[in-house]
Structures are given as structure tokens and as C-alpha cells.
């Protein structure tokens, strides 16, 4: 999972604290796997991917899960002074968007030159809305969510009030899916801060999972498409305002419930199941969730997936067998590419603004 803070927080308690760290790293790996799974469905089969129930299920909650975990790990950053905070977050989240965005355009243009197609890397394209509002949108969304929460914690007003104010403000920001992402980020923060709230979530975990499953039954193609065209629906008056509001609320709630469901599932089984050598080795990938998100997007989604197709395979064998296998291959290959990048300090500094 893309933990935008990229910080692992150890809790007190000996072996138990290690297991808690392990299960949240594994949760990040799980979410990374989901986003790759969704991209494989989207790009490697010639069909209407929105009609695919597996795709719609993944996309109902996986980005909310990313953001919830980011909020969970954000508390140490919230204690920083203003200038170091914004410098750190810009370096961590905005710089890679620029560095990898330019790299992707140059890589794409190298291929376009060979294929005699129009070049993508031009000053107008670099500064276009398409680039800034789409490429690596989640990193930019995470930066905005961090900034909103940070500014809220710096106010002199009571906690419940700044929470309400920032939630309201988030609904007015039209880019980077902030209206849906910030509530998940904030909930992750609150769950980490409040033991009583976390206890409530644990107590009602079965109810949360059941509600998510019920909502999935009504998460149709029409609902998915409508929830992703809210701005157009409002501008073109294609739907009554009340219906638009309910559709927006539905998307928000199903995302929160889905993220919470897997959050509490990993929380519940972590202590007893995840404390094995195999899971510990797998959890290492969770420490590179930001890099996995970026590198798999550039290398596979932007480049290799354009030359691969499994359309010759039947629909359900593709979805139930091919997609999970290909997704795992992409996940582990991406991790190896990241490992290679970090072997070259200059390259890692250039692409990620850090070294390990």
C-alpha cells in the first residue's frame, strides 16, 4: 500500500509491537497488489473493464485504503514545525511526480520517434491540466490531505471543530478525488490517535464487513460511472441534485466501509497469522509502497502493457487465473527494479529524492 508518510510506527509491547508493524506493512502490500490487479484488468483485456465486477469491487475501496493507512502513519509528521513539514512532504510526494512525469514523457517520446508519432514532451503538455491532474494523482492527493490535516492540527480551535471544518473544506476541492480521499485519511489519523475509537471499530468489525458486502451488491456499472462523472452531472444537469448528492455519498461510504473492512481484518488476524518468516519477508515490500506505485505505473502501465494482450483467453479464466498471476509477477518485478534503482545513489536521489 502506498503509505504517503513512508514512516513505520513501532508501538510499545515487545513482540506484539513487531507484529503490529508487520500487519500494517502487509496491508500496504495487499493494497499495492490490488491496484496492480485493477490495472491488469484495465489494460490487458479488450473489454469494458467497468462491467467487470472484480474491477468495480477493487475500485470501490482500494484508494481509500491507501489513504487510511497514510493517515494512520501520519502522526509523527503532524508534530513537525510548518516549514520542515511542507518541505518534507513536497520532497516526498510532489518531487517524484515531476521527476517521474518527465522521465515517462521522455521514455514515451523515445518510442514515438521510432514509431513516427507526435511527441508528448512539449512545454504545453508538461504544464497541461491532463498532466498535473492525472499523472500520479494519488501522490498529489496525499499531499493535499496531509496539508489539510496539518493546518487543522495547528488551529487553536477544539479538535472536533477543526475535524469538521477540514472535512467541509475537502468537499469543496474538485481535484485529485479529495472529497473521497480526505475522509479516509482523517479516519486513519483518528483511529491511530484514539484507542476508544479503534476499540469500537474492532467491536463492530463483522457489521462493517457485512455492510460493505451489501453495498457492493448495488455497486453497479451505472453507479460506478455516475460516481466518477459527478462534475459533468452537475454542470450538464443530467441528474437531479438530490440524486447526485446520494450518488456521491454512496461512493464515499462504500469506500470508507471497504477500507475499514480490510483494515480490521488485517488487524484481527495479524497477531496470530502473520508472525511467520514468509510474511515477514513479504512485508518488506510494504516499506517501498510509494516506489511500487510509481515504478509499476511507468514501466508496466505506461510502457509494457501497451504491447501485451490476453484477449484470446476466455473471460473468467483471464480474471480468476491470469490476472492474479500477472499481478504478482508485476509486483515482484517492480520491487526488483526498485532494488536496482537504490543500488545507484545518484539515480535514487534523482528519481525519489532519497537514498537508502
What is the predicted function of each stretch?
Residues 2-356:
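Alpha-helical transmembrane segments and their immediate juxtamembrane cytosolic regions
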Amino acid at each position: 500500500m502506498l503509505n504517503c508518510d513512508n514512516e513505520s510506527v513501532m508501538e510499545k509491547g515487545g513482540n506484539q509491537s513487531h507484529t503490529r508493524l508487520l500487519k500494517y506493512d502487509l496491508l500496504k502490500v495487499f493494497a499495492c497488489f490490488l491496484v496492480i490487479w485493477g490495472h491488469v484488468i484495465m489494460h490487458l483485456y479488450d473489454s469494458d473493464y467497468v462491467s467487470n465486477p472484480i474491477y468495480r469491487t477493487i475500485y470501490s475501496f482500494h484508494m481509500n485504503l491507501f489513504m487510511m493507512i497514510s493517515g494512520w502513519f501520519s502522526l509523527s509528521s503532524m508534530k513537525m514545525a510548518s516549514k520542515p513539514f511542507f518541505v518534507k512532504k513536497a520532497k516526498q510526494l510532489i518531487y517524484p511526480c515531476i521527476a517521474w512525469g518527465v522521465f515517462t514523457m521522455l521514455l514515451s517520446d523515445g518510442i514515438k520517434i521510432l514509431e513516427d508519432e507526435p511527441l508528448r514532451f512539449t512545454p504545453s503538455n508538461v504544464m497541461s491540466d491532463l498532466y498535473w491532474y492525472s499523472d500520479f494523482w494519488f501522490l498529489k492527493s496525499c499531499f493535499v490531505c496531509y496539508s489539510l490535516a496539518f493546518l487543522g492540527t495547528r488551529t487553536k480551535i477544539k479538535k472536533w471543530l477543526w475535524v469538521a471544518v477540514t472535512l467541509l473544506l475537502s468537499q469543496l476541492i474538485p481535484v485529485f478525488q479529495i472529497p473521497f480521499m480526505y475522509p479516509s485519511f482523517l479516519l486513519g489519523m483518528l483511529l491511530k490517535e484514539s484507542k476508544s475509537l479503534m476499540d469500537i471499530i474492532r467491536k463492530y468489525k463483522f457489521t462493517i464487513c457485512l455492510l460493505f458486502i451489501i453495498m457492493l451488491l448495488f455497486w453497479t456499472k451505472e453507479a460506478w460511472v455516475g460516481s466518477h462523472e459527478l462534475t459533468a452531472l452537475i454542470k450538464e444537469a443530467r441528474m437531479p441534485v438530490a440524486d447526485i448528492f446520494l450518488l456521491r455519498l454512496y461512493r464515499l461510504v462504500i469506500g470508507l466501509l471497504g477500507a475499514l473492512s480490510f483494515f480490521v481484518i488485517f488487524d484481527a488476524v495479524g497477531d496470530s497469522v502473520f508472525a511467520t518468516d514468509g510474511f515477514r519477508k513479504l512485508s518488506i515490500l510494504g516499506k517501498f509502497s510509494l516506489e511500487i506505485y510509481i515504478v509499476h505505473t511507468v514501466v508496466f502501465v505506461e510502457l509494457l502493457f501497451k504491447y501485451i494482450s490476453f484477449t484470446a483467453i476466455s473471460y473468467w479464466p483471464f480474471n480468476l487465473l491470469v490476472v492474479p498471476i500477472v499481478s504478482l509477477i508485476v509486483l515482484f518485478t517492480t520491487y526488483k527494479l526498485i532494488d536496482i534503482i537504490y543500488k545507484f545513489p545518484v539515480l535514487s536521489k534523482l528519481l525519489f529524492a532519497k537514498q537508502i
